[in-house]
């Protein structure tokens, strides 16, 4: 059974994406005492390789010192788990110092970009594109691998060709997410797409992917293909979420997680 630990340093986020309903503006940043408690608990829990993913909100809000100390603590005290690390961030707070640290631990980065500037900023807010691209360039300068999640909404799905070409022309790997009905909006379906629309999008991207095979990676399609050939899924079977009590949100619950809160 796959062993995956998701660490949520904060559910706050400096961006204000139109379709996002998982942010908590009052969320505090996780302290090192919480990290130490997590490590102590995990020392008694399992004895097999583990992946630790930092998620949010925006995990970089925790700052450089948090990651310096947390990565060192996990690597040393949980070395028997052969820990690997990953992070999901909008890259706004990426610095050279942070990138050097992540490179030291070979941490792959997942970020979020919905296509060209005009499409992206319409959905995610003015200035989002430029700030994410600035962080992207810092990460690349330090040799970090960055992949992007692109959220397709009722607006952007009509411009799927522009979005695909943007990622193709810029040499960026892509993972697509369908916008889901909001749990907080008075109009929950405003940005959401239907299952039928998502299916049509996958078929379009499969055709485009095959046409440009080897030039771009679309993770969803790769995972479908690997699952078919290997006859086993690539999804997480067991996920432990470590957060402060206020951070168990619908976004976290949605993952079919086994949640361990402090």
Swiss-Prot record:
Q: Which residues form the Radical SAM core domain?
A: 1-211
Kindly list the cofactors needed: [4Fe-4S] cluster
Q: Please give the family membership noted in the entry.
A: Belongs to the radical SAM superfamily. Anaerobic sulfatase-maturating enzyme family.
Offer an example of a GO molecular function term for this protein: 4 iron, 4 sulfur cluster binding
Positions of [4Fe-4S] cluster binding: 13, 17, 20
Which keywords belong to this entry?
A: 4Fe-4S, Iron, Iron-sulfur, Metal-binding, S-adenosyl-L-methionine
Which organism is this entry from?
Methanothermobacter thermautotrophicus (strain ATCC 29096 / DSM 1053 / JCM 10044 / NBRC 100330 / Delta H)
Record protein name field: Uncharacterized protein MTH_114
Which SMART domains does the protein's record reference? Elp3 (SM00729)
């Amino acid at each position: 059974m796959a062993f995956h630990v998701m660490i949520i340093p904060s559910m706050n986020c400096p961006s204000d994406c139109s379709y996002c309903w998982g942010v908590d503006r009052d969320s505090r940043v996780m302290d090192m005492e919480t990290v130490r408690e997590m490590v102590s608990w995990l020392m008694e829990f399992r004895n097999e390789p583990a992946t630790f993913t930092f998620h949010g909100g925006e995990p970089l809000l925790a700052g450089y010192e948090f990651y310096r100390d947390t990565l060192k603590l996990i690597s040393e005290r949980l070395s028997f788990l052969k820990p690997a690390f990953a992070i999901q961030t909008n890259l706004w707070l990426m610095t050279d110092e942070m990138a050097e640290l992540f490179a030291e631990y070979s941490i792959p980065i997942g970020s979020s970009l919905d296509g060209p500037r005009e499409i992206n900023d319409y959905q995610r807010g003015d200035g989002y594109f430029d700030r994410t691209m600035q962080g992207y360039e810092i990460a690349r300068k330090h040799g970090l691998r960055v992949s992007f999640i692109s959220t397709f909404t009722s607006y952007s799905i009509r411009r799927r060709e522009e979005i695909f070409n943007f990622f193709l022309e810029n040499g960026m790997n892509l993972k697509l997410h369908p916008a889901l009905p909001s749990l907080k909006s008075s109009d929950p379906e405003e940005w959401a797409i239907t299952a039928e629309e998502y299916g049509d999008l996958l078929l379009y991207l499969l055709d485009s992917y095959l046409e440009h095979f080897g030039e771009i990676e679309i993770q969803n399609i790769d995972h479908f293909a690997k699952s078919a050939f290997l006859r086993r899924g690539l999804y997480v079977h067991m996920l432990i979420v470590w957060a402060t009590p206020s951070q168990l949100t619908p976004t976290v619950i949605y993952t079919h997680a086994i949640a361990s809160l402090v």
